[in-house]
Every structure is written in structure tokens, then in C-alpha cells.
Amino acid sequence: FINKHASLLPSYKGLMPYFWTKIDNAENGVTFHLVNKKIDNGKIIYQKKIKTKFNSMIEFYLDVYDKFPVYFLKALKNLKQKKFIKSEINKSYYSIPNRKDYSNFLKKKGKVILFSNFFKIYKLVKV
């Protein structure tokens, strides 16, 4: 199995990576990796740094999923060629944020969703 994780693994393993990268002023990105018994710990088959600054968590994920087909095809190509990525990034793991974490997120001008995001989402799901 292949998993998509919205951070540059092995940093920010676990839940809500955008949230934690915002608090730490860290680089955003996406990683495709093979699934194993440990959380977000399998061999990395594709990584992409995302340099765009986003106004909300939803904008980040909309961007990631918009480009998902391109990223996924590159991951499959690397897997077929048995091309694995060795990352020199420090390992970290995060779980569910508490009130203090959320307060820090807001201090960093973090937003989960903006009112304008509702229109983008509506356009995507409109039938």
C-alpha cells in the first residue's frame, strides 16, 4: 500500500501536519511512502516541497489534492524503478493538538478555514 502524507517525512509524522508546520514555521510538502507497521514510517518513494504560503489549512489541502494525480504518478514511477528517497530531515511525530497548541497556531496567524474557502469547496462538490 502507498500512503500520501502532507509533510516532508520523516518530520511531522502523525496527525495534522500542516497545523504543526505552521506553528514551527517549517517547510510544507507532501510525501508518498510505502505503508508498514509504524505510523508514517515506510520507505519514501516521492517527496515534493510546497513553497506556496497558504492562508488556511484547507487551502493547503485543496492545493495538495489538486496536484495529487501528478504527484501520485511520479511516486508510482519511482516505485516501479525501486527508487527510494533517503531523507536527512529530523524525525518528529505529532498527535492531536491541545488548547495551548491551538493558541500557538492562532498566534502564528494560522487558520483552519476562511470564509472564502467555502466557495472553493462548494465549486468542487457542486453537482
What residue ranges belong to the model's regions?
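Donor/substrate-binding cores of folate-linked one-carbon enzymes
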Residues: F1-D101, F105-I113
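N-terminal targeting/leader regions
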Residues: I113, K120-I121
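C-terminal accessory region of SF2 helicases/translocases
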Residues: F118, L124-V127
